[in-house]
Every structure is written in C-alpha cells, then in structure tokens.
Amino acid sequence: MAKLVIVESPAKAKTIGKYLGKDYEVTASMGHIRDLPKSQLGIDVEHDYAPQYINIKDKSKLIKELKAKAKQADGVLLATDPDREGEAISWHLANILGLDPHEPNRVTFDEITKKGVQKGMANPRAIDEDLFNAQQARRILDRLVGYKLSPFLWRKVRRGLSAGRVQSVAVRLIDDREKEIENFKPEEYWNVDATLGTGHKSFTARLASDSTGKKLLPKNEAEARAIEKGLEGAEYTVGELKKGKRAKQPTPAFITSTLQQEASRRLGFTATRTMRAAQTLYEGVDIAGHGTMGLITYMRTDSLRISDEAVAAAKEYIADAYGEQYICPYKRTWKTKSVTAAQDAHEAIRPSVPGLTPDEVDKSISGDTAKLYRMIWSRFMASQMADCQQDTVSVTVYAGDYRFKASGYTVTFDGFTVLYEEATDEKEKKETSLPPLEQGQLLKLKELKSEQKFTQPPARYTEATLIKALEENGIGRPSTYAPIITTIIDRGYVEREQKKLKPTLLGRAVDGLMLEQFPHIVDVDFSAEMEKNLDKIESGKADWHKTVDDFYQGFAASLEQAEKNMEGKKVKVPDEPSSEVCDLCGRPMVIKVGKYGKFLACSGFPECRGTKRLVKDTGGICPKCGKGRMLERKSAKGRIYYGCERYPDCDFMTWDTPVPTKCEKCGSTLFRKGSKLYCAKEGCGFEMPVPKKD
C-alpha cells in the first residue's frame, strides 16, 4: 500500500507527488478542515478557555475521503506549510484521522524541489505542540475580541460593524497619521542656491551657514533677498574640500515584510496580491525543461539566513555571468531581529534553484508570478555580489560672509547595482557628480537663485510603509500583514486614495471610541507585548492558557466599564458630502456606507428616501455607442463592474477594467483582462500584452 501525504493545496500536491512517485499518494486538505464555529463564541471561558472546534461545514465530504484514504494507506504524513498556521492544520488533521501527534508523522518543506522534498521526507518529526499552541492562542484572542467587542460597536456606532485585535491597531496608526497631517502647520523657508562654473562645467551649491559656522535658512523672502544683497560682488572660492571613498552594500534577501514592501513600491502590488503570487511560486509551476517545481523557498519568514549551498550556487552564477570581481569576497551575514527557533528554521525568501534565471522562467510563466520571481531572484543574487564602490567629494564654497555646500560622488565600480537596487518611499537627497576642484580655486557665479519652500506634513501610509510600521512596532506576524490591510479596507474603516491609505469617517469614529473606551486594545506597545508573548508560547517559554487569561481579564473589565460609560449614548458617524443632488427633492446627497459598500442617499432622510448608486468616471468612452462615458459601478452584491453612462439606452457592461491606453487600431478604449489588453469595439479584435513597468 502507498503512504498518504496530505498538503493544503492541489498545486502543492501535484508538485510534491511528482517527486515522491508511486509509493506515495499526495492529496490536499484544501486549507483548514476545522475551526471555531461562526455562529457562537466557541470558547469555554469558564473552563480554561477550551476551544470548541467543529468541522468546517463544506469540508464534510473531503474529511470522509481523507479518513477512507488514511485507513487504506500504509501510514500518513502531514506535509502542511512550515509555520504556525500549517502546524495547526496538521494538528487538526491528526486529531480527525486518529493519528498520534507525538509520533513522527509531520514533515515540512522549506522549498518544493526534488532535493527539498527528499530532505523533508528524511526528517519526519512529531507535531510541534508549542507552535500549534501559539496559533491557537492567537485564534482564541482574536475570537474573544471580535465576538465580545463587535456587538458593543453595533449598539454604540452602527449595526454590522466588527472589531479585531490587531486590525484596530492598524486603524489607529492610520488615523493618528491623519491627525498629524491635519494638525500640521507648514512653515515657510527659502533655499538660496548658487550655480558655479569651472571652465565648461558647472555645479550647484546651497547656502549652509555664515562665516562663523552658524546655520542659515531664510524664513521669508525678505531674509533671502537680504542674503542675496550681501552676496553682491562676492568672490566664490573653494574653501574646504573633502575627498573620500565609500562602499554601498546590497540589501539582504527578502523576508515577508520586505517582500511585500518592495512589491508595493516597485510593482504596485497589494500585500494580498504579492502573497498570492508568492504562494504559487512556492507551491510549484511548470517550467520548460524542468517540469513542475517550486521556484522559491517558503515565503512566510522573518529570517535573513541563507544556506551555504545557496550562497555557493549564487556565487557560481555571478562569476559566470559577471566575472569573479563581482562576487562578494567574504560571507555576508545580516542580523535577524529576535526570532524563535521555529521561525529561524526557515531561510530568507530566495530562488530555490539560484541558477534558474528570470529570462529562462519567463518562457513558462507570465504576469504577477514572473514579475515577482524576477524581483526575488535579482534581490537574492545582488545580496551575494560585491559592494558598489564610490569616490565621494564634498565642498564648502566661501562667498564673503557666507558658506555654500555641495556634495557628489562618482561610481568607480558598480558591483551589485549592475543587477538590483532597492526602491524607496522617500525622495532621496540628490547627489550629483562634481567637476574636478582644487582648494582655493576661484569659481564663476553663473546664477544666484532663491526659492520659496514650505515644510511638508508627514505622508499618509502606503501599504509598504504601513507594513514597515507594523513590523518596526512588533505588531502582527508575516502571515498577518496582508489580511490586516484587506480587513480594514473591507470593513470600510480605511480606503485607498491614490495608493495612500486614508481613514474613512467611519474608521475615525470607531478609532475614537476604541481609544476612549479600550485604550489598551489600540495601544501599540500593548499589542507588541502580546506578539512577544505569542512568540514565548511558540518557544515553549509561556503557557497559552495564562497568556489568554491575562489578556481577557483586563479586556472583560474594560468592556464592562465601557457599557456603563456609554449607557444611553451613541457615536454619530458624520455623513460624507458629495456634489450630487437628489432627483426626488433637490437636496444635496451624502455618501453613506451600506452592506455592499458606499452609496448616495438624500440628506433629507427620513423625509426623503432618495438613493443612488455611487459611480466613478473611469475616463474611458463606451466602445459600443461611442458616446457615453464608462462608469465604475457596484452590483447588488458589491462586485465592481463597468457600464455605459447612457444605460438603459446603451446596455454595454463588462467586469474588465478600462485603461487609459487607447486602441492602436481604432482609437477606442482598451480593457484589461489578466495579462492582456483588448479592444471591445465590435469588429476590431485588437489585443496586446499589458506593458511592463520600467
């Protein structure tokens, strides 16, 4: 009889099955098979917080099939993902199938390649109870908060609202940033720049100080003009000249948080989109000449560690492709933040076969997976390459009683930058190449320019910067970053505005209530401490029952006090104004949030019950009638679609997104479907791939 191997997904089963052969049957559990009940709390608070797990309703047939296969098999191996969530799935599978969790029936794969699968199969172990308990404690904590706090929000804010332990902190961060922006008072200042020439070359230096070294930054035009006047007739000479060398090091291979941040900045991916593509790359894809294989190591990791074998493979490729001088001459190591032994069991995210280049992979995959693989591969390879070497120069220019400064650099050896440089959220200070300069050299003033500036408020969070803030504050885990953002947007607490995260009026109202009545729930330090406690459970250094009880006792007391504080009170969420007018009574319409998202309602409610669907102009023209604008609409169930504004006179509609690019053949609006753009105008038939970003 064959041995039964159970994984989460059919894709993973297919890849692993290819490596194991006919002596094994590999099947999928399709994720979790048991969970807490949806209709009730499912936790016995009075009896040590015992969870009351039930089989997931639509998994009954699958569970029956798994039991039958396990009964016939010559042994069962549980091969779910190597993290808390995967350990929990295996624990529940063992429980349902009657397996002894203390027996070596658990295997894990850091990479799904032939070698990775063989290594995992050669090292079976018992289910890690501590790892499972960490997941179980998190699940129970989140359930207690969600089920106890949500009804309170229903009564005090609006029906249908829900609250989450970690999500509430994320909303707090976003709302706090919005308050900073609102309270920010811009301050005027002026830059005074001198464009200076040396023969045919010139450079720009900025006013820095007076001759005593006192910093100067004019606060208004009068001060700037006074400095300009003081510079009339001044000689500009090279006063101080500092030359040096610096080495710029590459960034380490990705961990989960940095992968999501970089994919957001470089590719424009949401965290969810990134993890979906990464999951596909890990579980396996068909590659010409290689068959089905996992292309990257496990993508939920905090560890920066790279195996010696992978480093050697990378350096071999670098030597062949770029030359020996591009190899890092020493073993690079990066300090990983404090992680548990289980967390550090993984490597950083890297290509499972370093020699398999993106160009070769692109022949077999496309779209998000191809883009993400190229980024992961390039970042990993660059991490094993030599430093970028630069000659630096900084100059202080003397001009009468004033001092100007400029700095620049010249790349003498490109090193890792020939392949990859990290994207950034902030505008970097510009450094340019300076012409050859000598101390005491007389410079020619070509232009003296003063420019008004104002200090800028902090920027709203993007997905990338929010994930960075969550990670830096110790909130959440690699597996939770993407769901956190999805949840707070889906709940209507936060919305995207030009790729920035902005709190809605509802989100601000709920955050204000949480801050007032449950300050510890939305406290960043408190949440970070809870994450540390969960890590202690994972390491076997803390009891999960005590961790849950310590939290719940304080939470229950806060909830009881909040009920007293808010007795007879309700939080009013301000309506969002709009430019629309009610067709029934002519009053202004306001934007409200319903079960399926935002809609327009008459401000005269309840006297007038006029409503409209909220539509958004996409900028495209209807390909059917050629007259109406293409509008973004929502179906009755909240799904976004696109239709002609002339409906019902024109009934054109599509689920595919209109794009700014026009049809090269007929000039009509193009629509995006997957990785292609197409023209929907009858008889045209034009198609093209989605252009790659630079």
Language model features by range: what are they?
Residues 1-139, 148, 209, 215-225, ...:
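Intrinsically disordered, low-complexity regulatory segments
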Residues 2-3, 150, 183, 224, ...:
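Basic, low-complexity terminal or inter-domain segments flanking catalytic cores
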Residues 14-37, 168-215, 383-430, 588:
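Structured, non-catalytic alpha/beta "coupling" segments that mediate domain-domain communication
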Residues 112-194, 243-244:
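C-terminal or mid-to-C-terminal helical accessory/interaction module adjacent to the motor/catalytic core
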Residues 212-252:
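Metal- or metallocofactor-binding catalytic centers and their adjacent structured scaffolds
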Residues 238-241, 250-263, 290-299, 457-469:
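Short acidic, hydrophobic short linear motifs in intrinsically disordered regions
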Residues 275-279, 485-486:
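Short, hydrophobic-biased segments on the C-terminal half of alpha helices
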Residues 282-297, 491-500:
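A short, conserved structural fragment
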